[in-house]
Amino acid sequence: MDTLNIAGKHYNSRLLVGTGKYKDFEQTRAAIDASGAEIITVAIRRTNIGQNAGEPSLLDYLPPEEFTYLPNTAGCYSAEDAVRTLRLARELLDGHKLVKLEVLGDPNTLYPNMLETIKAAETLIKDGFDVMVYCSDDPIIAKQLEDMGCAAVMPLASLIGSGMGILNPWNLQIIIENAKIPVLVDAGVGTASDAAIAMELGCQGVLMNTAIAAAKDPVLMAGAMKKAVEAGREAFLAGRMPRKLYSASPSSPTSGLIG
């Protein structure tokens, strides 16, 4: 069976979704159900998963028994902040080890600071975490993160929240060809065709939040993204026909024609 394998666990869905930017937890739940996602990512610094007693908790709407939580470090600008945030998440989620690391470079672009990211990844891996890492689309950096022991690399397609789609498919393709761990596109997806293209390139999965949450109809878009990821994966496995400027062979048979 064709499944996504991350840190020794298999998942049927290759679509990973965020939990932020929805109007309320009810809409969050409805969109995630429509997406079919099994892995959901949560910003520990922005979302209550038990650290704020007396306030509504995401855990009440998306129980950890139903989903694999992927705590992330959105809003962290240093390795120290990221490590501290994920250690807190591990305490709140009873020893949970699978995490998404992102260390941002500046608040305008949210581009990853790779020096701080590598520093944090080293510490987290030594501390027993399974690290899925948000990174630039630099093939050398991606390979270094794999060699360090990261569970997955997640290069950006374009800037977080931009909806610009895949701006550099060639770098993504190099990363995919060189990798022995899952490569997932993270950031920049704007619509279903972007997700399909990522999967057609050979990505093992796609992670998104804003593309669904900021849609006019988030629940409908979540369903569209599910279909796009599935179609893109099947197209990759099927193998597309070669590109040609023109074809000398007609698509219809020529034998047996009259005259």
UniProtKB/Swiss-Prot annotation:
CDD domains, sorted: ThiG (cd04728)
Catalytic residue positions: K100
Residues holding 1-deoxy-D-xylulose 5-phosphate: G161, A187, G188, N209, T210
Keywords: Cytoplasm, Schiff base, Thiamine biosynthesis, Transferase
GO terms classed as biological process: thiamine diphosphate biosynthetic process
Enzyme class: transferase
GO CC terms: cytoplasm
Recorded superkingdom: Bacteria
Catalytic activity: [ThiS sulfur-carrier protein]-C-terminal-Gly-aminoethanethioate + 2-iminoacetate + 1-deoxy-D-xylulose 5-phosphate = [ThiS sulfur-carrier protein]-C-terminal Gly-Gly + 2-[(2R,5Z)-2-carboxy-4-methylthiazol-5(2H)-ylidene]ethyl phosphate + 2 H2O + H(+)
EC numbers on record: 2.8.1.10
InterPro entries: Aldolase_TIM, Thiazole_synthase_ThiG, ThiG
Molecular function per GO: thiazole synthase activity
Pathway given in the UniProt record: Cofactor biosynthesis; thiamine diphosphate biosynthesis
Subcellular compartments: Cytoplasm
Subunit comment: Homotetramer. Forms heterodimers with either ThiH or ThiS.
Role summary: Catalyzes the rearrangement of 1-deoxy-D-xylulose 5-phosphate (DXP) to produce the thiazole phosphate moiety of thiamine. Sulfur is provided by the thiocarboxylate moiety of the carrier protein ThiS. In vitro, sulfur can be provided by H(2)S.
Family, similarity comment: Belongs to the ThiG family.
Record protein name field: Thiazole synthase
Native source species: Methylobacillus flagellatus (strain ATCC 51484 / DSM 6875 / VKM B-1610 / KT)
